[in-house]
UniProtKB/Swiss-Prot annotation:
It is an enzyme of class 1 (oxidoreductase). This is Uptake hydrogenase large subunit. InterPro entries: Ni-dep_hyd_lsu, Ni-dep_hyd_lsu_Ni_BS, NiFe-Hase_large, NiFe/NiFeSe_hydrgnase_LSU. The keyword Membrane applies. It is found in: Cell membrane.
Amino acid sequence: MTTQTPNGFTLDNAGKRIVVDPVTRIEGHMRCEVNVNDQGIITNAVSTGTMWRGLEVILKGRDPRDAWAFTERICGVCTGTHALTSVRAVESALGITIPDNANSIRNMMQLNLQIHDHIVHFYHLHALDWVNPVNALRADPKATSELQQMVSPSHPLSSPGYFRDVQNRLKKFVESGQLGLFKNGYWDNPAYKLPPEADLMATTHYLEALDLQKEVVKVHTIFGGKNPHPNWLVGGVPCPINVDGVGAVGAINMERLNLVSSIIDRCTEFTRNVYLPDLKAIGGFYKEWLYGGGLSGQSVLSYGDIPENPNDFSAGQLHLPRGAIINGNLNEVHDVDTTDPEQVQEFVDHSWYDYGEPGMGLHPWDGRTEPKFELGPNLKGTRTNIENIDEGAKYSWIKAPRWRGNAMEVGPLAATSSVTRKGHEDIKNQVEGLLRDMNLPVSALFSTLGRTAARALEAEYCCRLQKHFFDKLVTNIKNGDSSTANVEKWDPSTWPKEAKGVGMTEAPRGALGHWVKIKDGRIENYQCVVPTTWNGSPRDSKGNIGAFEASLLNTKMERPEEPVEILRTLHSFDPCLACSTHVMSAEGAPLTTVKVR
């Protein structure tokens, strides 16, 4: 049956039904079903989050100063982002300001996470959708060295011997029959287009990125004490500054500042000399693969982040842009007010929650987390062994957030789409430079590859910002400012009887918001609306589909039984299902079984 959605997509649930469950190389648990016609083109898509989030329920009645420590445990991949958003929400509610040094340190920690997350995503979660490590065994190491020197002449690891050593390591993997992290790939699928030398170069950088990621996160251990889940503080940051101290536990001294500086330099070198060149090199072989646009050229949302000055979240003060684009009008960027109940609402008509009446949308301050697991009449299978979900009923543990009634895509591509705003010429120049280097039109941005490219551009931009705030912190310290926390309102006796606030960040995956209500010194209500809630949204009461589902439509599959193309597009969002949902079914049993590896 063919239907037209209000947000402009044609769905046809006839044809062959393909089930990908679980979707791997993501954080959390996700299921995807698509219908494919006789030409191998996807005509319908259904995205299901298969875990239930209960942390909002856990937070009720707790001390708001502790909320960051709970919300941070939502996810270990985007570690720290939920904590930062949480302390901002509580500070917003209680009118707490933070010192300039705390703002710089928070920004550096968030920027460090952006860089780390984007590198891990590109090489370890997404690259294998485009790169064939088995094909790398056919490469000529000398030709690979020449390719590396042409793509990135500044990267020092480029000799034929270096690539030959990596190739020999790969050969041992393959000959042993134990492919490990390369197991279960569709390596003979014609969707893979790279020549062997490009495959060897990219696989080598995959291994280099593994080594880099353990160094990058040391910034979090320096300022936050550990990683994952560094420590945070309502009112600032928990690390005192003692530049003359040597080895002082927990204090920031010159030794630690020098280490931070060296990590920033290493991140910058890798991003500029490996990550961005690899993106261009790999993308150059897939320039015609412009599927996966979905909502990206139509409706996008960015909260913005990285305030230049503490306590000022006005759009003009944010280094990462804020704004919303709807109806495909890239020339009009709407401002975003997350406190406005007319702007942000969540719907649950197709989610396993209950709001009491159909079609009701709730602003997060009034949001509810009341599970209601029920399956539709057209389900194929059983409650614990679902063959095909019924998308006409409830089918996901993810809610359906909407901005002024519109399904929105969030993430680095959404932020990139907002650069028509005055004050972000540096981002605009990045985008124009990439398109010029790859000889692509602006329309190419609104695709799976464009989404992936936006992450790389954001990583490079964040490297520059991290250096900016490091220099700002050092200058403040030299001028005698060592303040890192404001504890004037730490005591609950200074708080109002009732208060509410909102915290926002631009997480690596996109717009993240926490809304809190405080009463008598305790959390009365707490709601998180996370990037994958926006992107992984099921249908709403009007039939609008979310970003995941929209992005898969009209994609041509080489072999429907080997869903390389589905994984490419879903991975381009870097889904984090643990952030958007938590815990399995009430019985603790898996809801589905694997249909396609």
